């Protein structure tokens, strides 16, 4: 669960939160929608999950109101079940490199 509309952001603010999980990011409209929601909430940062992957995570991370991204592409269930931890290590290292490239 997470925020996916302005009413949810308002509720988070009522609880004193300034960082909210935004879910499901891509099905809800992606970065364009997050930017539209974020505009009036200048003190709120977002952590999108849901549809984030190696192909689109860079664009999310370039937006200064994104504090972090979640993505299951790095640790898929089939990789865990098959014990393919080397692939998980490779994918998480790639994700960390993307973060370092964008955020320093």
Regions found by a protein language model. Give the residues of each.
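Catalytic cores of alpha/beta
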Residues: 7-15, 38, 52-68
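Active-site beta->alpha loop and helix N-cap motifs at the rims of alpha/beta catalytic domains
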Residues: 1-3, 8-24
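Structural preference for beta-strand elements that scaffold enzyme active sites
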Residues: 18-19, 43-47, 67-68
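Conserved, mostly hydrophobic/aromatic
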Residues: 20, 60, 95
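Glycine-rich phosphate-binding active-site loops on the catalytic face of alpha/beta enzymes
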Residues: 9, 21-30, 65-87
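Glycine-rich beta-to-alpha transition loops that act as phosphate-gripper elements at the mouths
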Residues: 1-6, 26-28, 48-54
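C-terminal helical cap(s) of enzyme catalytic domains, especially alpha/beta-barrels
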Residues: 78-104
């Amino acid at each position: 669960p997470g925020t996916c509309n302005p009413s949810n952001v308002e509720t988070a603010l009522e609880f004193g939160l300034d960082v909210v999980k935004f879910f499901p990011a891509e099905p809800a409209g992606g970065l364009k929608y997050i930017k539209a929601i974020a505009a009036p909430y200048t003190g709120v940062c977002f952590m999108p999950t849901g549809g984030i992957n190696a192909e689109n995570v860079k664009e999310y991370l370039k937006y200064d109101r994104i504090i972090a991204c979640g993505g299951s592409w790095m640790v898929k269930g089939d990789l865990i079940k098959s014990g393919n931890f080397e692939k998980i290590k490779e994918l998480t290292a790639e994700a960390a490199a993307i973060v370092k490239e964008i955020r320093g």
